[in-house]
Amino acid sequence: MTKGLAFAVALAVAGPALADFQDALSAYDAGDYETAYEEWHALAQEGDAEAEAALAGMHLVGAGVAQDFGKAAEWYRRAAKQGHAVARLNLGELYSTGRGVPRDYVQAYMWLGLAAAQGSAWADRRRAEISWSMTLAQIAEAEDLIRAWQTRAK
């Protein structure tokens, strides 16, 4: 298959999902949180990381749903496992503060480290900040987890 044809096929497959995501975003921006939630939830059920992160954000701030840090963490985790950088950053923040998940600096450092490796300067700063609350053994454990994730992603 030529590169042009492969790109066209990828666009044809991604097109409807992208349109649905944009429809949900438009609904969200207009304050129609119910429609946004329904659209993103349908996409998230299909494994769309952007939609999973969007649902997490709705639960994080309580936009159209009850604020629920636990549900936010669940949705962020699903997106983060797919490599979504913002989800990784936000999941790391939840672990560092213990909101919705037990406080766990190793997990926080790992998720922030993965986001930092994707170019997030904020995640890199936050990782450095929480490292002051960690032992050297915890930092080494978190670094090992980061390497394991990066190896799996290759």
Write out the residue ranges for each language-model feature.
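Sec-dependent signal peptide recognition
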Residues: T2-A10
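N-terminal signal peptide c-region/cleavage motif recognized by signal peptidases
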Residues: A14-P16
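Hydrophobic face of amphipathic alpha-helices that form TPR/SEL1-like repeat modules
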Residues: D20-A27, E39-L43, A54-V61, N90-T97, ...
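TPR/TPR-like alpha-solenoid signature
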Residues: F21, A53, E74, L89, ...
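Short helix-capping/linker turns of helical repeat alpha-solenoids
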Residues: Y28-D32, W40, Q45-D48, V61-A63, ...
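Terminal, low-structured helical/coil segments at or just beyond the last alpha-helical repeat
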Residues: W122-K154
